Regions:
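Short loop/turn motifs that connect adjacent beta-strands in outer-membrane beta-barrel proteins
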Residues: 25-38, 87, 102-107, 123, ...
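Solvent-exposed loop segments that connect transmembrane elements
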Residues: 196-212, 243-271
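Short glycine/proline- and aromatic-enriched beta-strand/turn motifs that initiate or cap beta-hairpins
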Residues: 27-84, 288
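Residues that define the transmembrane beta-barrel architecture of outer-membrane proteins
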Residues: 37, 59-63, 89-93, 106, ...
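Outer-membrane beta-barrel "beta-signal"
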Residues: 171, 227-230, 256-257, 261, ...
């Protein structure tokens, strides 16, 4: 596994130096160009990189760096995240683009993302793209909720389509008793990922051709603390996947025998621990470089 840590950490160090020079609160946009434009630069250290309930870092620390640029409704987003897959990619690169219109208390995000895993070992690759639509409804100044739907025609190049649906509820908790400038919020998520039959081995999946990848539910509860440009997250995640189906879905190289064998997709009864209940923490920052020095 080429587990990319050194280069993201260098990026992280440079971004922290920039963030520390930012103002405690971003100034209001001073020009019409700034009014229409927004750029967010950030980085995050994670005790475990969890995506839809599955550990993408094999329950090891991970680091991410990202840039999000928006002009009016249009936006583009790029994220680099260290991962640990069975195909040993150097890093996960996510490139997304779309529109984010606002209608009263409703905010929309409609776009597509491409997940790229350079440096994978073996003949099977995991790169794929996914279209998504998200709605966020701000019920009050502190309470918001919204659904998400996403579709991928070929998840991990396995030949299987994937449809993901989720709902999110977020609430900003009272902060009067906290130090000045410190806020905290609670978020709850529940999602379900459905898959079609595979046509090949796929990049990370252990499922053979013609077999459907195991569908599953996932859920998350998190607390996020924010102070100026810095953010701390405490998270609990879990899925409905059995350890045997977790192996089928992830192809985990650290899977162990002793489970229930399935002649179709898991004849050895291998068990993976990448999809179970997990507590994790994140520490990061984000800021708008367009407002530096204002």
């Amino acid at each position: 596994m080429s587990y990319l840590v050194a280069h993201p950490l260098r990026v992280l160090a440079c971004l922290i130096a920039m963030a520390c020079g930012a103002r405690a609160e971003e100034a209001k946009e001073a020009t019409s160009t700034a009014d229409q434009s927004k750029v967010t630069v950030g980085a995050t250290l994670m005790s475990d990189y969890i995506y839809r309930g599955i550990s993408y870092s094999a329950h090891q620390p991970s680091v991410a760096a990202y840039v999000d640029a928006q002009q009016g409704w249009l936006y583009g987003y790029t994220n680099f995240n260290s991962v640990k897959f069975s195909t040993s990619p150097a890093v996960e690169v996510t490139v997304a683009a779309g529109i984010r219109p606002t209608l009263g208390p409703f905010e929309f995000d409609i776009g597509a993302a491409y997940y790229y895993y350079p440096g994978e070992q073996g003949p099977d690759l995991s790169n794929y793209w996914e279209a998504h639509a998200t709605l966020s409804h701000k019920v009050t100044d502190k309470l918001s909720w919204g659904p998400t739907i996403a579709y991928a025609p070929d998840v991990w190049q396995s030949g299987a389509w994937g449809v993901y649906g989720a709902g999110t509820l977020a609430y900003e908790l009272p902060s009067e008793f906290l130090p000045t400038g410190l806020t905290w919020s609670l978020s709850l998520d529940f999602g379900r990922w459905l898959f079609g039959p595979t046509s090949g081995a796929g990049g990370v999946s252990a499922a053979g051709g013609g077999l459907a990848l195991p569908a599953f539910n996932n859920w998350h509860a998190g607390l996020k603390f924010s102070y100026q440009v810095f953010k701390l997250g405490l998270n609990y995640t879990d899925t409905s996947l059995s350890k045997e189906n977790c192996y089928v879905l992830t192809g985990d190289l650290g899977a162990t025998p002793g489970g229930v064998a399935n002649p179709g997709d898991n004849p050895l009864g291998l068990r993976s621990r990448l999809c179970g209940a997990t507590f994790s923490a994140t520490l990061g920052f984000e800021f708008n470089p367009l407002t530096l020095g204002r």
